[in-house]
Amino acid sequence: GSHEWENRLDNGIWTYTLEDIWGGLQDAYADMAADVKKQYDVELDNIGAIGFSAMMHGYMAFGKEDELLVPFRTWRNTITAEASEKLFKEFNYNIPQRWSIAHLYQAILNGEEHVKDITFFTTLAGYIHWQLTGEKNLGIGDASGMFPIDCSKKDYDETMVQKFDALEADRKST
């Protein structure tokens, strides 16, 4: 099944609401069930496994009660140029504006109120996985849309994580 997504510009941010997200998934599931009925004349009532393709970029920040702190910021936003440039200089590694770390760092640079309350942030793909499985994790492909990956370890690049942490510590001390 599929669903035609259309984000909206809300207060200068390209976003989808949580209702858009779940409505889109329901629409895709209904489309898949109708396709199964059409092709095989079978009512779909049980699925052994299912996969979703969702955005591996963007920014969904959550607080201690697992509440969304700010509207979802999609890959389409170009509001993170300052963060992207500063992270490139620090890491000597291209950090596209759509990456989650660019969104987080831009929120930090902007002094956005929600940053102090973040306990977890992820992409749309990570959010859907978490909501369907209860697990807050990403596959390596989706994780590569959040932060640079160390391919040999199949994890985030620890040197760059340390540089990011130092950047934030330096910013707080000035």
What is the predicted role of each segment?
Residues 1-13:
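A short small-residue
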Residues 12-15, 27-173:
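Glycine-rich phosphate-binding/catalytic subdomain of phosphoryl-transfer
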Residues 17-25:
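Phosphate/oxyanion-binding active-site loops and adjacent basic polyanion-contact surfaces
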